[in-house]
Regions:
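Short beta-strand/loop motifs in extracellular/secreted proteins, especially
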Residues: 33-35, 44-48, 102
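Short strand-edge motifs at loop-to-beta-strand transitions and within beta-strands
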Residues: 23-25, 68-72
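Boundary/junction segments of secreted and surface-exposed precursor proteins
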Residues: 2-22, 27
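Short, surface-exposed beta-strand/strand-loop-strand elements in extracellular ectodomains
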Residues: 43-58
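Extended extracellular/luminal ectodomain segments enriched in beta-structured repeat modules
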Residues: 29-36, 82
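Non-cytosolic beta-sheet module surface loops
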Residues: 39-42, 93
């Protein structure tokens, strides 16, 4: 199954900076399994949330600075369309902060490549 356009694959690292909220969509595919994310929000605290179709799957414990790991169970609906296998990762910088730098990596379910 091909991923939808403008959607990143899993096993991808995303980097950014600036202010406000950054949303990136990732295709995890139809195979269920545990998904692990690593992140580095550096000095300026950021909040990271992962959503599937508007439902929160995982999040950092508020605004955090530094390295961390988070994970969630991926249980996609069987027989879905490619959009059913997409999650949205939302990174929000500290409100009022002029800039922030961060990166994260999101793995594939069950550690597959």
């Amino acid at each position: 199954m091909e991923r939808p356009p403008n959607v990143e694959p899993c096993n991808t690292e995303v980097q950014s900076g600036g202010r406000g909220i950054t949303e990136t969509r990732h295709f995890l595919g139809p195979t269920p399994g545990r998904v692990t994310m690593t992140y580095n929000t550096r000095i300026e605290p950021d909040r990271i949330r992962v959503y599937h179709r508007g439902r929160l799957l995982s999040e950092t414990p508020g605004f955090v600075a530094g390295n961390g790991t988070m994970s969630f169970d991926w249980n996609p609906p069987p027989g879905g369309s490619p959009e059913d296998y997409v999650v949205t990762v939302e990174v929000m910088g500290t409100p009022g902060s002029p800039s922030t730098r961060w990166d994260y990596g999101i793995g594939c379910p069950g550690g597959r490549r």
